[in-house]
Amino acid sequence: VLPLPQIIAALKIGAAIPQRALALTFDGGHISVYHEAWPRLKALGFAFTVFIATDFIDAGSQNYMSWDQLRELASSGVTIGTLGATYGHLVSLKEAKAAADIARANHRFMDEIGSIPELFAYPFGEYSANLQAIVARHGHSAAFGHHSGVIYRGADYLALPRFPLVGGYSNLARFRTVVDTLPLPVADLVPADPFLSNNPPALGFSIVGEMGPLDNLACYLARFGKLNLEQLGPSRIEVRFPEALPIGRNRVNCTLPGPGGRWRWFGLQLLVH
């Protein structure tokens, strides 16, 4: 278990990372992170990141950590990231309002923590090309969604995946699968903007590197199950949806058997409005 900024920095310069290295993240700043998660992880020497919506902290609710508690975490080596101020649907806001939300949060972090977080997490995992650009302009070097997958050096650092471990996915079997998973690197992803203008979208990507035969590549969407794939040439994959995607968040997961019984995984979220 490594600090998330350390993993990002190593990937960007091509430095070695241990096999099965992982980072732990929590969204929202709930008080249970302070009282339950932090003592256990500290005893194990495990680093983690907590993403904060500053309005929730400023409201003073007993359900969320206080600024004093966040300063205590930060001084102990916990990474503090940002969700913006309101934890609202930023992707649906006009550009100026989304930018103002992120900027207001950064001002609060400067006031209370003394620095602007390097890492951003999109509320509800929702992002668009425009929102990615806004996040970058406000000084955040990496941003995370809620789609599943393994990060790798050539990934889009403003659209990084995370494996959720909540609800029905919060069990040891799921955790073991996640830890064993390998990246499925892709390039030339279409559509470039996950905030869809056409529905159903023409989804396609190119597999990067030597992954062996792609006959066993499979992509899934919860609403439709296993999706039809068409391979164009040695590495280009086109995904065919049987009908328009429903309004809201649609997560596509693509897997390919890898070495040693492990799985390669690429995920993305498509947003219909």
Task: Kindly give the residue locations of the regions a language model identified.
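Terminal accessory/targeting
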Residues: V1-A21, S32-H35, P39-F48, I52-M65, ...
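A structural signal for short, well-ordered beta-strand segments and their strand-loop junctions
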Residues: V1-P3, A121, A143-G145
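Metal-dependent polysaccharide deacetylase catalytic core of the NodB/CE4 family, i.e.
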Residues: I8-L22, H30-L131, S141, G154-P164
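Acidic, His- and aromatic-enriched active-site or binding-groove loops in soluble protein domains
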Residues: F26, H140-G149
